């Protein structure tokens, strides 16, 4: 029979889920970080990842709208500001667009979403649906993938700067900001989950929420790997580096 865990035991279980299932374990990330992708494959990653970046503040706004405690809302709304910024040139979304600009992707193509892989779109929409439909505790728990973000960000920045001459430190500014934002956000979310997951059922739900979020991130990389690495089957309406690079230059 499952026993009620102490808060620290619950944290250990959550960290074990991340150690096993977080997308730093995905083969696509190994290729990205070790310089094994070509420019077109890196472009495809950045373009598809923008859909996830674009929806982060939508996700956080959905969670915020369900918080009845003003003190809790004041803390959570910082996440929206981090990504939306205080002006069109500020925030995480703007910094990601700076990356796609630096990679030579037409901004209209990126922002329109018309060249996304179906798997990307479905995974992101599944995440938005989850935070809107599940309990507030589960929605907050689903954000706990940020516990594991600093490690993968460090690998990504170092690897991309070492291996890709078309990437600059300025282009990767998004990740430098996340090195401070993600730990702040995950510390708060972890404390909230440890405090409020006070029954066996709730503890099972928060672990399932983190498991689900890991699957969302993993599914996005699965879609990229199938389309742009092996077997190389690209959805006909999705980004094709050769075709869309020519379109960008026209």
From Swiss-Prot:
Catalysed reactions, as listed in the record: 6-(2-amino-2-carboxyethyl)-7,8-dioxo-1,2,3,4,7,8-hexahydroquinoline-2,4-dicarboxylate + 3 O2 = pyrroloquinoline quinone + 2 H2O2 + 2 H2O + H(+)
Matching Pfam families: TENA_THI-4
GO BP terms, alphabetized: pyrroloquinoline quinone biosynthetic process; sulfur compound metabolic process
EC primary class: oxidoreductase
InterPro entries in the cross-refs: Haem_Oase-like_multi-hlx (IPR016084), PqqC (IPR011845), PqqC-like (IPR039068), Thiaminase-2/PQQC (IPR004305)
Pathways involved: Cofactor biosynthesis; pyrroloquinoline quinone biosynthesis
Ribonucleoprotein keyword on record: no
Keyword tags: Oxidoreductase, PQQ biosynthesis
Domain of life, per lineage: Bacteria
Family: Belongs to the PqqC family.
EC number: 1.3.3.11
DNA damage recorded as keyword: no
UniProt name for this protein: Pyrroloquinoline-quinone synthase
Function noted in UniProt: Ring cyclization and eight-electron oxidation of 3a-(2-amino-2-carboxyethyl)-4,5-dioxo-4,5,6,7,8,9-hexahydroquinoline-7,9-dicarboxylic-acid to PQQ.
Molecular function as annotated in GO: pyrroloquinoline-quinone synthase activity
